[in-house]
A protein has these predicted regions:
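Histidine-bearing beta->alpha loop at or near hydrolase active sites
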Residues: 150-155
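Serine-hydrolase catalytic machinery in alpha/beta-hydrolase-like enzymes
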Residues: 1-49, 160-185
Length: 185
């Protein structure tokens, strides 16, 4: 069988849905979603101790900022900082993640297969940054791939009241690129 575990990093940080609107968690963006990565490692720790879960078959999937956690959980530097030695996800499925931040050693990843899914028309996060990141990882021989869905936006699988929606107003990182200061430890 398959078991699922839903991790809600946003509510723990004071960001909750209000009625049918989503409240943006500004702290997630201020720190480029890095706080969600340790959350993903703690979920892996918890799941790996469950007697009915095979710790070698746990995958991670995240959406938007959560997709960033799913994507970068395989970065060896972050695993060393926040992960548990010897414990790794079996697969990663980031859904429309922000790939527009470059971190030190972010191309030094584990052998976790990564499959990114993005919408061609996503204006929240630049799709080209995910394509470029995947190219860097493939050049290192990693098992990574990206699926770009034509004519789709950020949050393409989401529905409100059974209808496809797309919000043009709100936080938009679409033309921003970030790079970690290489002089920091």
């Amino acid at each position: 069988g398959i078991a699922t575990f839903v991790l809600d990093s946003n509510s723990a940080r004071g960001c909750r849905k209000q009625e049918k609107k989503v409240k943006i968690c500004k702290n997630a963006y201020l720190h480029q979603g890095l706080g969600h990565i340790p959350d993903a490692y703690r979920a892996l720790d918890l799941l790996s101790t469950h007697p009915r879960i095979d710790p070698n078959r746990i995958a991670v999937m995240g959406f938007s900022i959560g997709g960033k956690a799913a994507l970068y959980a395989s970065v060896k530097r972050f695993q060393k900082m926040w992960g548990t030695p010897g414990l790794d996800y079996a697969a990663s499925v980031p859904m429309y993640p922000p790939c527009n931040a470059t971190f030190k050693e972010d191309d030094e990843i584990t052998d976790t297969p990564i499959r990114i899914h993005v919408g061609e028309l996503d204006t929240y996060f630049p799709v080209d940054s995910c394509i470029n990141y995947i190219a860097r990882l493939k050049a290192k021989g990693k098992d990574v791939d990206i699926k770009v869905y034509p004519d789709t936006h950020h949050g393409f699988e989401g529905k409100i009241d059974g209808k496809k929606t797309w919000k043009t107003k709100g936080y938009n990182d679409g033309k921003c690129y970030y790079e970690e200061n290489p002089s920091l430890p």
